[in-house]
Amino acid sequence: MIRLSAAAALGLAAALAASPALAQTSATAVVKAGDGKDAGAVTVTEAPHGVLLKLELKGLTPGWHAAHFHEKGDCGTPDFKSAGAHVHTAATTVHGLLNPDANDSGDLPNIFAAADGAATAEIYSPLVSLKGAGGRPALLDADGSSIVVHANPDDHKTQPIGGAGARVACGVIK
């Protein structure tokens, strides 16, 4: 009886693990600065209508910084241009959370780094999904995606990137 119960439980666990309903619900990005130094981590958790980000960053210059989802899971170059443009839908969109037209899906609120260079925040984005739920762009698509931190804050209106400046940190979302 005990062997049968253990076998049934093992079979049930295997079936549940393969279930699409229990697909990956969170992902992590290990963030690096352009010089390769550790700059912290970002956890992205699937929510019913978007994603919740938990950012724990370090080594930033004090003050406000833009953060965006970028379309490629590639932080291989020191300037992080390999991460591509912002995540976006198939439709033509423009940059900026304050833009009256549809903004691109990579747009996020600014983050603030304290005097010691640390930035800790939770941000909700209804614009993306880990796997494409609700028709939102998938962060974990075939070429992946990344989170990029910029040198300056985003004004949320100016094209193409809101005056955010250079890319200073990047992490591939996995």
UniProtKB/Swiss-Prot annotation:
PROSITE patterns referenced in this protein's UniProt entry, alphabetically: SOD_CU_ZN_1, SOD_CU_ZN_2
Binding site for Cu cation: H68, H70, H86, H150
Pfam families named in the record: Sod_Cu
Similarity comment: Belongs to the Cu-Zn superoxide dismutase family.
Domain of life: Bacteria
Paired cysteines (S-S): C75-C170
Subunit relationships: Homodimer.
Entry keyword Zinc: yes
CDD domains, sorted: Cu-Zn_Superoxide_Dismutase
Subcellular location: Periplasm
Cofactor notes: Binds 1 copper ion per subunit.
UniProt GO cellular component terms: periplasmic space
Signal peptide extent: 1-23
Principal location: periplasm
Name of the protein in question: Superoxide dismutase [Cu-Zn]
EC number of the protein: 1.15.1.1
Record has Oxidoreductase as a keyword: yes
Keywords noted in UniProt: Antioxidant, Copper, Disulfide bond, Metal-binding, Oxidoreductase, Periplasm, Signal, Zinc
Necessary cofactors: Cu cation; Zn(2+)
Lineage, top ranks: Bacteria, Pseudomonadati, Pseudomonadota, Alphaproteobacteria, Caulobacterales
NCBIfam families per UniProt: SodCCaul
Catalyses which reaction(s): 2 superoxide + 2 H(+) = H2O2 + O2
UniProt cross-references to InterPro entries, sorted A to Z: SOD-like_Cu/Zn_dom_sf (IPR036423), SOD_Cu/Zn_/chaperone (IPR024134), SOD_Cu/Zn_BS (IPR018152), SOD_Cu_Zn_dom (IPR001424)
